[in-house]
Curated annotation (Swiss-Prot):
The gene is HYD1. Disruption phenotype: Results in reduction in aerial mycelia, conidiation, hydrophobicity and infection ability, and complete inhibition of pigmentation and primordium differentiation. This is Class II hydrophobin 1. Homotetramer. Further self-assembles to form highly ordered films at water-air interfaces through intermolecular interactions. Cordyceps militaris is one of the famous mushrooms in East Asia widely used for his medicinal properties due to the chemical constituents present in the mushroom, namely cordycepin, cordymin, polysaccharides, glycoprotein, ergosterol, and other extracts. Fungal disease of Cordyceps militaris caused by Calcarisporium cordycipiticola is destructive to fruiting body cultivation, resulting in significant economic loss and potential food safety risks. Overexpression of HYD1 leads to enhancement of disease resistance with negligible effect on the agronomic traits of Cordyceps militaris. It comes from Cordyceps militaris. Its main location: secreted. It comes from the Eukaryota. Disulfide bonds join 38-87, 48-78, 49-58, 88-99. Residues 1-15 form the signal peptide. Aerial growth, conidiation, and dispersal of filamentous fungi in the environment rely upon a capability of their secreting small amphipathic proteins called hydrophobins (HPBs) with low sequence identity. Class I can self-assemble into an outermost layer of rodlet bundles on aerial cell surfaces, conferring cellular hydrophobicity that supports fungal growth, development and dispersal; whereas Class II form highly ordered films at water-air interfaces through intermolecular interactions but contribute nothing to the rodlet structure. Induction: Highly expressed during the whole fruiting body development with a 13.14-fold increase at the sclerotium stage compared with the hyphal stage. Expression is regulated by the GATA transcription factor AreA.
Amino acid sequence: MQVLLIATLVASVLAAPTEVSPQTSGGGGGGGGGGGVCRGFLYSNPICCATDILGLACLDGDTPPETPRDAKNFKEICAKNGQQARCCVLPIIDQAVLCIRPLGV
């Protein structure tokens, strides 16, 4: 039973998209929202993550302290604290489940 559960989890992770394209701010204006760095329905939560465990879990992670403009800015914001930029499915109390790198990072 446990083997079936683990196999199902691994299969679902492998079937998920591996990269998420960043959203452009649309030009003009003073910048856009940071909601575009993690696009897509599932991987929509930007997280600065200290430890990424094979994309299955992100330990000691939190939302970025400032709103990222794009994927490069997202990476820079997280790097200031020695963390990695990730787009995750489910953030829960300083951890997140199923995380990927945003496109351009």
